[in-house]
């Protein structure tokens, strides 16, 4: 699964536990760099190069390398990469890429040591993986060192909002992460920009990773993104496709939608929650059941029974619902 960032699983889990145990959702802002800054981190090598081939499984070899930042000049480099990067790389294509040759020492996190498996393609919010086609606008944006003059003003805000309309899913995610992580951009958001962001999250023809980042920003930064996202969250639960697979591409988007509704105390039609009970993702199913319990506790058990009666119910979902029903009945016995 293509995660939009390395911090998102921890962020979602913290919000998830708050939701499941009926706590108010107040998620601390994660400390993550804007993607352009991440490319220029002191432990990152930034370069432009041409993809050649895959010499070994999960590796990419680049030639005609031009190192821009962080490393010594070289003619070629081989980096370890995830499945997404392996699918994306096209022989003969010129790329902007970033990798890390060191990692935190197992003995002490304050020291850096060489990676035993060799250079690793960077994975960071908005550049996950850090492998983008070297088009003129991409080179101009990424191969210049970050500066407040270039990236903190209205021009970069306009560029980021326009980038969400790109046909390239990677650029959508990069600019969504810029809006998420660059505080100077968040502070400039007005009514018009917020309206455009709400519309973007609802567009199913946009990259789900980018939509998830914007919605999570709305959950974490309500002062800058506004407190009127509940209608967006409710529409997502009503319209997003339901899958019987355990891993759903839109699961992060939906977790955050549940988080916003819980934060704002918003009630939604039960039928919009019911459609998630029988999905293949246990966390989403449980979030839906807890939302139903908050609104109409008397309907939770009948809806579980209804889902269990479906012959097409996925095995994993059936096991989860049986266990959830057992816990629910035990909880009711204790109350009685």
Give residue spans per PLM region.
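Bacterial N-terminal signal peptides that target proteins for export
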Residues: 2-15
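Extracellular C-terminal loop/segment signatures of secreted glycoproteins
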Residues: 80-166, 170-171
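Amphipathic alpha-helical scaffolding segments comprising HEAT/armadillo-like alpha-solenoid repeats
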Residues: 152-162, 186-201, 224-243, 266-277, ...
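Structural detector for internal amphipathic alpha-helices that build alpha-solenoid repeat scaffolds
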Residues: 140-150, 173-187, 209-224, 248-266, ...
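Structural detector for short beta-strands of small beta-barrel domains
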Residues: 42-65
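Bacterial N-terminal signal peptides
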Residues: 12-24
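Short boundary/loop segments of OB/S1/cold-shock single-stranded nucleic-acid-binding domains
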Residues: 29-43
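Short coil turns that connect the paired helices of HEAT/ARM alpha-solenoid repeats
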Residues: 164-170, 202-209, 239-252, 278-283, ...
């Amino acid at each position: 699964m293509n995660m939009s960032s390395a911090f998102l699983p921890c962020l979602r889990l913290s919000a998830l536990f708050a939701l499941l145990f009926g706590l108010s959702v107040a998620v601390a802002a994660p400390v993550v760099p804007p993607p352009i800054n991440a490319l220029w981190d002191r432990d990152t090598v930034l370069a432009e190069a041409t993809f050649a081939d895959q010499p070994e499984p999960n590796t990419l070899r680049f030639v005609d390398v031009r190192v821009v930042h962080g490393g010594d000049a070289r003619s070629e480099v081989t980096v370890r990469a995830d499945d997404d990067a392996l699918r994306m790389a096209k022989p003969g294509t010129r790329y902007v890429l970033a990798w890390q040759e060191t990692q935190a020492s197992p003995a002490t996190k304050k020291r850096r040591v060489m990676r035993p498996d060799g250079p690793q393609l960077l994975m960071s919010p908005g550049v996950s993986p850090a492998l983008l086609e070297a088009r003129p606008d991409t080179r101009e944006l990424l191969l210049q060192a970050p500066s407040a003059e270039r990236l903190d003003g209205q021009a970069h805000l306009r560029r980021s909002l326009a980038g969400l309309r790109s046909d390239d899913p990677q650029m959508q995610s990069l600019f969504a992460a810029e809006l998420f992580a660059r505080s100077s951009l968040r502070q400039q958001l007005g009514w018009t920009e917020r309206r455009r962001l709400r519309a973007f999250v609802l567009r199913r023809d946009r990259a789900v990773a980018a939509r998830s980042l914007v919605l999570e920003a709305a959950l974490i930064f309500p002062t800058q993104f506004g407190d009127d996202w509940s209608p967006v969250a409710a529409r997502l639960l009503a319209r997003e496709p339901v899958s019987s697979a355990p891993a759903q591409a839109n699961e992060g988007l939906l977790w955050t939608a549940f988080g916003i509704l819980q934060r704002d105390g918003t009630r939604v039609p039960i039928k919009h929650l019911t459609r998630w009970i029988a999905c293949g993702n246990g966390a989403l199913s449980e979030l839906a059941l807890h939302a139903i319990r908050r609104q109409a506790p008397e309907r939770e058990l009948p809806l579980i029974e209804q889902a269990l009666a479906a012959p097409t119910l996925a095995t994993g979902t059936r096991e989860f619902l049986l266990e959830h029903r057992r816990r629910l009945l035990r909880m009711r016995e204790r109350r009685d």
